[in-house]
């Protein structure tokens, strides 16, 4: 599994809840492609913290690059939508073609890898981000309010999928 976040604490919450999932190792092509996309203050890492300085395009380009990688089987995307560089409010979404929610839905359907999204909204501010979550939900993207919950659910889904696909029923019980 790999992770893309724009806040370090979300990265930590997700990492603390990996469960049986293992952190991916980027192949050289993925590492190099990300290095070209990222500013020098961001370290290329499978638990990628874009910082609040990432806009819609950088987020989407990193998601695409990671989903294209043969060494990544699943992805968790964590978004703290308060960043001024992201178009995440209802008003911004209405005015912006190619906003992040739309891009995420398209990318997930293109690459078809297990992916979950956490949209961490501070209490009292959630209403201005309703449309963002609605677009993800209506696009079939599993969406959660916290990174830890998203990672727990991704872990359960991947384990279920492997168990069902490989018919390891005994493994499910362990």
Which residues are covered by each model-predicted region?
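Short glycine-cluster motifs
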Residues: 1-89
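Peripheral docking tails and interdomain loops at the edges
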Residues: 1-4, 9, 15-23, 92-174
């Amino acid at each position: 599994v790999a992770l893309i976040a724009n806040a370090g604490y979300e990265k930590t919450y997700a990492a603390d809840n990996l469960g049986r999932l293992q952190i991916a190792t980027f192949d050289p092509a993925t590492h190099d492609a990300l290095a070209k996309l990222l500013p020098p203050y961001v370290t290329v890492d499978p638990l990628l913290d874009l910082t609040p300085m990432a806009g819609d395009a950088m987020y989407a380009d990193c998601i695409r690059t990671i989903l294209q990688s043969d060494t990544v089987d699943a992805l968790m995307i964590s978004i703290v939508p308060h960043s001024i560089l992201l178009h995440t409010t209802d008003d911004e979404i209405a005015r912006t073609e190619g906003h992040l929610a739309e891009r995420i839905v398209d990318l997930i359907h293109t690459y078809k890898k297990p992916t979950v999204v956490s949209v961490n909204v501070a209490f009292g501010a959630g209403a201005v981000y309703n449309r963002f979550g609605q677009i993800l939900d209506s696009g079939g993207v599993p969406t959660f309010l916290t990174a830890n919950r998203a990672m727990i659910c991704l872990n359960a889904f991947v384990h279920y999928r492997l168990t069902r696909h490989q018919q390891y029923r005994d493994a499910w019980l362990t």
